[in-house]
Amino acid sequence: MLDRKPLRRRRTLSCGIVVVLDSRELLLCHVTGQRQWDLPKGGIQSGETPCDAALRETHEETGLSLTPAALLDLGRHDYTASKDLHLFASLSERVDPRALECTSLFVDRRSGRSRPEMDGFGWFAFDRIGALCAPPLARLLGRAIDLERVVVELVAGRERLAA
């Protein structure tokens, strides 16, 4: 008798950046037409590294231009049944959310018009993640990633560079 293992579907990979302040807040983007807020993140393109994809997606979805040297690699995590999420973190100065702009567009099924993927931005305390984000992201940021530790590591790294 053949021992057949169930076929596992290939998981897609999204990459993004958790942009944090030393005041224990993070940047979230409001998803156009939805109630939830999200991180700047998206799919990896052929030939890109996870870091390249995270930087590109963050720039497209917020206008922020970050550098690889400013990133802390948080690794690849199970996100949904069919998707993994590779996250990085970056310590930022407070940017006025009204100055941010999403240039990544999608075609709205109802209107047929192109709309930005993200239509709002804000800085939110870590304890608001569960109320604002979709459950898979809230679970990931609440359990698998210790955002308090991330801020401590990023601040220590900034201080080492300044010394």
Regions found by a protein language model. Give the residues of each.
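Active-site-adjacent beta-strand/loop module that shapes the phosphate/pyrophosphate-binding cleft
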Residues: H77-G112, G122-D127, L140-V151
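Short, P/G- and charge-enriched loop/turn segments at secondary-structure junctions
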Residues: M1-R8, L74, V107-G112
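Short hydrophobic/aromatic beta-strand or adjacent loop that forms the aromatic wall/cage
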Residues: T12-G16, K83-L87, M118
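Catalytic phosphate/metal-binding cores of nucleic-acid and nucleotide-processing enzymes, i.e., regions
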Residues: L7-R9, L13, V31, A54, ...
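Conserved hydrophobic "DFG−1" position in protein kinase catalytic cores
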Residues: V19-V20, L28, S90, W123
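Conserved N-terminal beta-strand and adjoining loop/helix that marks the start
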Residues: M1-L26, S46
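Conserved Nudix-box catalytic region and its N-terminal flanking loop in Nudix hydrolases
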Residues: L21-S65, A163
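A short coil-to-beta-strand element that immediately follows conserved catalytic motifs
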Residues: S65-G75
